[in-house]
A protein has these predicted regions:
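Extracellular low-complexity Ser/Thr/Asn/Gly-rich intrinsically disordered segments
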Residues: 4, 258, 269-277, 306, ...
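Cysteine-clustered segments with highest specificity for TGF-beta superfamily mature ligands
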Residues: 231, 243-254
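Long, low-complexity, repeat-rich, intrinsically disordered, solvent-exposed domains used
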Residues: 236-243
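Extended low-complexity, serine/threonine- and proline-enriched intrinsically disordered segments
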Residues: 1-7, 144-190, 195
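Short, low-hydrophobicity acidic/polar segments
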Residues: 1-150, 158-160, 196-211, 215-219, ...
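C2-type phospholipid-binding modules
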Residues: 267-290
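Solvent-exposed, low-complexity segments and loops of surface/extracellular structural proteins
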Residues: 115, 179, 186-198, 205, ...
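Intrinsically disordered, low-complexity repeat and linker tracts
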Residues: 283-321
């Protein structure tokens, strides 16, 4: 559907969510509920991919639908399934129909019989990616040395190909509507292949894949740091990344110096590369994280995440590039 609207897949039929949050079916006829079989049970699933690229045809089996998406750090992949909660039960009238429904909830939700009691699909939404923001700060008094470090571009080396099971066979809602451990086998398996994805900024082109090219993500003006007393400076916008605990980091930067006797010429370019970095706990799906670039000088840039100690394993700096 246009505009990257979420898709619901119900018995091979498609729908989109309108601007008014209405479910609009492609052929105009809702595929549920059955008037002939009022106790026939349905499951509902939803996914959202933004403008993620489909790199392989979808796979449909008797028990699942799997899509294959490639991300570039700007898309939020979302999954959802329908199940009622305690609040849905509290809205039900106190009558025999409700008692029957609650005694047979595992067999009747969602169905024509439950719909007549206004038990509508209650979607539980999950963000499958983590949001990562970046800041930079001087950790040595570069200003006193007549030096400044300017950041040109930052990249993460991460998996970008997702095998996304968007719908799957599931027994569905149990009799206990508060049992949140009963979930369908949907979600993402990430391929091990990695790509270099650059941190975008406001002027990075919006076309898919633009963040794979450094020239699309070079900061202009370049954020510079020299005073360790200054607050950390936010750089770029954000990256949406898989929930991984190992990745690579690449930082491109330049030295600006006013010292005529400096052994490194002003304008010299550097690249700090950190390969196979492991961080305890990793990035968590649906959560925000912050990576701080700690600049000590042209030959040392450390990394810190969420205010915790630095990454396990180190990196190397090419001087100059």
């Amino acid at each position: 559907t246009g505009g990257g609207a979420p898709l619901c897949l119900v018995n091979d039929r498609k729908a989109r969510i309108s601007a008014a949050c209405e479910l609009l079916w492609a052929d105009g006829e809702p595929p549920y509920y059955s008037a002939v079989y009022p106790e026939h049970k349905y499951n509902f699933f939803l996914y959202y991919k933004g403008d993620a690229e489909e790199y392989a045809p979808e796979q449909r089996t008797q028990g699942s639908i799997t899509k294959f998406f490639r991300i570039d750090g700007t898309q939020d992949l979302i999954s959802a399934y329908a199940r009622p909660g305690t609040e849905d039960a509290e809205r039900l009238p106190d009558n025999d129909e409700t008692k029957y429904l609650m005694n047979h909830a595992g067999d009747l939700v969602y169905s024509t019989k439950s719909a007549r009691l206004h038990v509508e699909p209650h979607l539980r939404v999950k963000h499958e990616l983590a949001q990562v923001n970046f800041k930079v700060q001087a950790f040595d008094d570069l200003a006193a040395q007549g030096r400044e470090i300017r950041i040109q571009a930052v990249a993460l080396v991460i998996p970008t190909k997702a095998q996304f099971t968007v719908a799957a066979d599931w027994a569905g809602v149990s009799h206990d509507w508060t049992d949140e451990t009963n979930v369908p086998p949907t979600g993402i398996v990430w391929e091990t292949e990695r790509d270099t994805v650059y941190l975008p900024h406001e002027n990075t082109p919006e076309e898919f894949g633009s963040t794979y090219q450094m020239e699309n993500a070079m900061f202009n003006p370049e954020p510079g740091v020299s005073d360790p007393k200054a607050e950390p400076m936010k750089i770029g916008t954000q990256l949406l990344v898989p929930p991984v605990d190992e990745m690579g980091v690449i930082i491109h930067y330049r030295l600006i110096t006013t010292r005529p006797d400096d052994l490194i010429p002003s304008g010299s370019l550097f690249t700090a590369r950190y390969a196979n970095l492991h961080f305890e706990g990793g990035f968590q799906a649906g959560k925000q994280h912050e990576v701080l670039l700690k600049v000590y000088g042209p030959q040392r840039v450390d990394l810190e995440i969420d205010g915790l100690p630095g990454w396990i394993d180190g990196g190397d700096v090419e001087i100059p590039e």
